[in-house]
């Protein structure tokens, strides 16, 4: 049963991530009158939707009893403040990570950023080994290195994108490099820390998602105030929202639920593979649908490497002859 849930959750993650990327691209390219929707507010609304969905799922698990739901929420969240506070750590780190990536993008050329940021694949594996005691074989480590290279090639910027930042100073590039490296380590730690909480405590995935969403909403509202406070006060929180925007928000909320399920029933490393495959899938669909991407030989090389790495990670060599104990 758990194996079925693992592959089902990974499949849904690929579908959700691909759909989200495509709808986000499409929604941001539409030319409409009035202001565009603010991505910072969309993140907050998605967190609230995720919380509401999780409360409904807890309600369903409580045999559709409002009294039982209130008891579960009271016992598992209000009566366990320290357990709830544990989720402030990954939520805060994710917020910090988003800010670090903004600094990195402002101080690095696109190619350096894309290649360096793929180190998060290896940092996730390192934290999985050190914090969860996960054992990886030689083929699995090799597949992670190949995956890192493949994703970097798939997302390699075109010549027109590279022309933007040729005159960056050495000091500026150092700041950008430190920012992206810190983001890589924080991403790996936060993901594995959340996995450790999900797998080593008795609270359900939905309760943990409510706790994570609570802190995510707080940090998200802080982000709205800092980055878009002036625009919100001028045009409103829901400026630019339309039917497509709500689809994007709903997909983001679904992503939070699916990622938690993937981490619970699979792990962060497999999540990385699923996300990498969705990058390729969304890019190919984008070429045919949105026509905003022209595949290059570098992209095809990266796609081959990602697919090869995926198969290599699952490769389990049969011991020949008399097996020896490690």
Curated annotation (Swiss-Prot):
Result of altering residue 47 to D: Decreases UDP-GlcNAc transport activity
Annotated phenotype, changing residue 42 to V: Does not affect UDP-GlcNAc transport activity
GO molecular-function term, one example from the UniProt record: UDP-galactose transmembrane transporter activity
Pfam families named in the record: Nuc_sug_transp (PF04142)
Transmembrane segments: 4-24, 38-58, 136-156, 174-194, 212-232, 243-263, 269-289, 293-313
Family matches, as NCBIfam families: nst
Function: Transports diphosphate-N-acetylglucosamine (UDP-GlcNAc) from the cytosol into the lumen of the Golgi apparatus, functioning as an antiporter that exchanges UDP-N-acetyl-alpha-D-glucosamine for UMP. May supply UDP-GlcNAc as substrate for Golgi-resident glycosyltransferases that generate highly branched, multiantennary complex N-glycans and keratan sulfate. However, the exact role of SLC35A3 still needs to be elucidated, it could be a member of a catalytically more efficient multiprotein complex rather than function independently as a single transporter.
Name of the protein this chain belongs to: UDP-N-acetylglucosamine transporter
Source organism: Mus musculus
